[in-house]
Amino acid sequence: MIKVEDILRAYRHGFFPMADSREGTVSWCQPYQRAVVPLDSFRPSRSLRRVIGKKRFTIKINSVFEQVIRACSQPRSTGQETWLSEEIIKVFLKLHRLGVAHSVESWQDGELAGGLYGLSMGGAFFGESMFFFRSDASKVAFAWLVGYLKRKGYLLLDAQIMNPHLESLGAIEIPHEEYMVQLERALGKKISFV
């Protein structure tokens, strides 16, 4: 069973957990190329700026963390496995109760429409996963998160492993060595997420 201390130690050293399936073995990942979102240069796409401007979604923090992480754990398509095992979910629920793991949620018409969750340590936010029930909901939550982190003085938004969706949101890849320098600098800051 993964312990809270294991997670905190791993993240401080550039590792993160990933399961091979819902009930599968948990591995510790430290990719050579790390996906990060440059907070200073982030600019939402024109289409996302239009969606944000329509104010279709209301953003909340930490109001339904467990719902968010469980929605993130659902396979994206039929037959697709998830990397979020029950073991990882349970330890992140503990981290949330300790004030380390957080959710950013998009709500529409009183219903959860999408969102994301991650871990906050010092001036680093480790984005774990996103989901949506309604189109653009997770993108709006993500754009809100970037602005929030900038206002709070965060230095690093770690997106972990690049994929086309993250790339469309402005993530870039940096070498492991550069990531570790940014991580050490960010962990040296004292910032409270909420």
UniProtKB/Swiss-Prot annotation:
It catalyses: N-terminal L-lysyl-[protein] + L-leucyl-tRNA(Leu) = N-terminal L-leucyl-L-lysyl-[protein] + tRNA(Leu) + H(+); N-terminal L-arginyl-[protein] + L-leucyl-tRNA(Leu) = N-terminal L-leucyl-L-arginyl-[protein] + tRNA(Leu) + H(+); L-phenylalanyl-tRNA(Phe) + an N-terminal L-alpha-aminoacyl-[protein] = an N-terminal L-phenylalanyl-L-alpha-aminoacyl-[protein] + tRNA(Phe). Coiled coil: none annotated. GO terms for biological process: protein catabolic process. Its main location: cytoplasm. Pfam families: Leu_Phe_trans. GO terms for cellular component: cytoplasm. Its EC number is 2.3.2.6. It is an enzyme of class 2 (transferase). It is found in: Cytoplasm. It comes from the Bacteria. Keywords: Acyltransferase, Cytoplasm, Transferase. GO terms for molecular function: leucyl-tRNA--protein transferase activity. The keyword Cell inner membrane does not apply. Functions in the N-end rule pathway of protein degradation where it conjugates Leu, Phe and, less efficiently, Met from aminoacyl-tRNAs to the N-termini of proteins containing an N-terminal arginine or lysine. Belongs to the L/F-transferase family. This is Leucyl/phenylalanyl-tRNA--protein transferase. It comes from Chlorobaculum tepidum (strain ATCC 49652 / DSM 12025 / NBRC 103806 / TLS) (Chlorobium tepidum). The lineage of its organism: Bacteria, Pseudomonadati, Chlorobiota, Chlorobiia, Chlorobiales.
